[in-house]
From Swiss-Prot:
Covalent link Cyclopeptide (Gly-Asn), residues: 1-30
Lineage: Eukaryota, Viridiplantae, Streptophyta, Embryophyta, Tracheophyta
Organism: Viola arvensis
Family matches, as InterPro entries: Cyclotide, Cyclotide_moebius_CS, Cyclotide_sf
Posttranslational mods: This is a cyclic peptide.
Any single GO BP term: defense response
Name of this chain's protein: Varv peptide G
SS bond list: 5-19, 9-21, 14-27
Keywords linked to the UniProt accession: Disulfide bond, Knottin, Plant defense
Protein family per UniProt: Belongs to the cyclotide family. Moebius subfamily.
């Protein structure tokens, strides 16, 4: 599976460094 960052991003942004909002609405390592 995709490594997640323990964060959701319904607003479209992730606060965790090195993470992107993909697939929405879950932050994953980019």
């Amino acid at each position: 599976g995709v490594p997640v960052c323990g964060e959701t991003c319904f607003g479209g942004t992730c606060n965790t460094p090195g993470c992107s909002c993909d697939p929405w609405p879950v932050c994953s390592r980019n």
